[in-house]
Regions:
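Ribonuclease/tRNase effector modules and their secretory precursors
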Residues: 135-292
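Canonical tetratricopeptide repeat
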Residues: 50, 84, 97, 130-131
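Structural motif corresponding to the intra-repeat A-B loop/turn of tetratricopeptide repeats
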Residues: 26-27, 60, 107, 140-142
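Alpha-helical repeat scaffolds
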Residues: 31-39, 65-76, 109-122, 144-155
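Alpha-helical segment of the N-proximal tetratricopeptide repeat
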Residues: 9-38, 42
Length: 292
């Protein structure tokens, strides 16, 4: 009898396979989406997998499919009376609400997002969405003057984007022979990384159709430039560009270990251009160009 029970549980889910799939979401979302689709076909009663799958679809921009998966998973879960009467159903609803909030953010429906955050303070605290509450408030134009001076870098950029502020913020990711840099920063570009040229090409190549949507207010793009820098003490040929959602306003740029399995834009053609005889450090060139 016990064996039959175990056999039945395996028909509903596979915790090992599910865990393996979740582990590749950040590094290879396209493969994760494909694998989750196959997983759901094998285990259609694993309702949480629909939420994970929908989140990935949002990340890669397949919005209609994400909406269909959310609807299908919700309907199947609600049709199962045993599941609805279990403690897991409450957890399922919380996960469902999270992906629905992300959907609101993707569609820039910030008013509904803000109203939900205001009306559900306990859920906001439990799911650590205080930043999302503030950001949605900013997007709705409800921030007051007393709060402006206290805004974090990201919040202030959402409120009123300033490229000079971005350039100053970016210095922590640039190495220099003549000045120290914060060794606590996990991702740093190499000294010979041509930041100015690369930034120009980034602006020229950013295409909203190629974005990845992470979190609630940010888009992410991946670029390749061989030997660009290091991330977590490992050399890498890729870097990430984070922008405010659905805009070309750049929040930060940093080397990444995750670009290999994402759609990325190759900027190695810059390497073929003539290099100056006398090399200046990144920060030297940076200051020469942007110094007031």
């Amino acid at each position: 009898m016990k064996k039959d029970k175990n056999k039945k549980s395996k028909e509903y889910f596979n915790c090992w396979e599910y865990s393996d799939l979740k582990s590749i979401i950040m590094s290879n979302p396209l493969l994760a989406a494909e694998k989750f689709k196959q997983y759901i076909e094998k285990y259609p009663k694993d309702y949480f997998s629909y939420i994970s799958y929908a989140n990935i679809l949002l990340t890669i921009g397949n919005i209609k499919e994400a909406e269909n998966v959310i609807k299908l998973g919700s309907n199947l879960a609600n049709e199962n009376s045993n599941f609805k009467n279990s403690n897991k159903y409450r957890d399922f609803l919380e996960s469902l609400n999270y992906v629905l909030l992300r959907l609101l953010a993707y569609n820039e429906n910030y008013t509904k997002l803000y109203e939900y955050c205001i009306n559900n303070p306990e859920k906001i605290r439990k799911n650590d969405l205080n930043s999302e509450l503030l950001f949605s408030k900013i997007k709705c134009g409800l921030i007051n003057e007393n709060e402006i001076s206290k805004l974090s870098y990201k919040a202030s950029q959402l409120f009123n984007y300033d490229e000079k502020l971005f350039l100053e913020h970016e210095k922590k990711h640039l190495k220099s022979e003549d000045s120290s840099y914060d060794t606590n920063v996990s991702s740093v570009f190499n000294i010979d990384f041509p930041f100015e040229k690369v930034l120009k090409e980034i602006k020229r190549n950013i295409n909203l159709d190629n974005k990845y949507f992470y979190g609630f207010f940010e888009d992410k793009y991946f670029f390749r430039y061989d030997g660009c820098g290091e991330a977590f003490h490992k050399n890498t040929d890729y870097f990430e560009v984070i922008t405010i959602h659905n805009t070309n306003n750049i929040l930060t740029i940093y080397p990444s270990l995750d670009g290999k399995f994402h759609n990325n834009i190759d900027l190695n053609y810059i390497l073929l251009e003539d290099v100056p005889t006398r090399k200046l450090s990144q920060i030297d060139k940076f200051n020469m160009r942007y110094k007031k």
